[in-house]
Design a protein with these regions (language model features):
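Intrinsically disordered, low-complexity acidic/polar segments
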Residues: 80, 97, 106, 137-139, ...
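Conserved strand-loop elements at the edges of beta-sheets that form or border functional pockets
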Residues: 59, 67, 90, 99, ...
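Surface-exposed, glycine-biased beta-strand/turn segments
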Residues: 22-84, 112-113, 140, 150-152
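Conserved catalytic core of two-component sensor histidine kinases, primarily the HATPase_c ATP-binding
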Residues: 54, 92-94, 125
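Short histidine-centered loop motifs in beta-beta connectors
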Residues: 76, 90-114
């Protein structure tokens, strides 16, 4: 009986810290647009070695783009198409927002969850990419948006 109890205690000492450490690294993200619809990529797109793990978000009533997590702005870029990109980071994660029509943050600004960082034109798509260091991650695994559009 004592050996079973001892084995149980030893296993708890090793298993509990590992599971707590694994949970510590997961990231849960608030949706950057209220009432957003996640738009899947088109079916007939070219496939490359690296999957494009970007997700598109559309929201008719909401055009204010908000931070999905607390972080710090590392870059604000205007593209050739006059749209803006905002990149910010939290721990080892980088969040890349593309397609903003107006930006209200600047490099090195600290962001809080749900803090506005810019706007999109009504009907336009906001693209979100997530990276852990340089490795792209699937945003749908972490994003808390309510509706996913079906493409049948």
């Amino acid at each position: 009986m004592k050996s079973k109890v001892r084995l149980l205690l030893v296993s708890l000492l090793f298993v509990a810290p590992v599971s707590v450490y694994a949970q510590k690294d997961s990231v849960w993200l608030k949706c950057p647009l209220d009432e957003a619809i996640i738009v899947p990529p088109p079916k007939n797109v070219m496939k490359f070695d690296e999957p494009d793990l970007c997700v598109g978000l559309v929201s008719v009533p909401d055009t204010t783009v908000k931070a999905c997590i607390t972080g710090r702005v590392s870059n604000v870029i205007q593209n050739e198409d006059e749209k803006w990109d905002v990149v910010f980071y939290y721990r080892d994660y980088y969040f890349w927002y593309s397609g903003l029509s107006k930006v209200i943050v600047k490099k090195n600004d600290n962001l809080k969850v749900s803090q506005p960082l810019g706007y999109i034109t009504p009907g336009d798509k906001l693209e979100l990419s997530i990276f852990k260091f340089e490795t792209p991650l699937d945003p749908t695994r972490f994003l808390d948006c309510k509706v996913v559009m079906k493409t049948d």
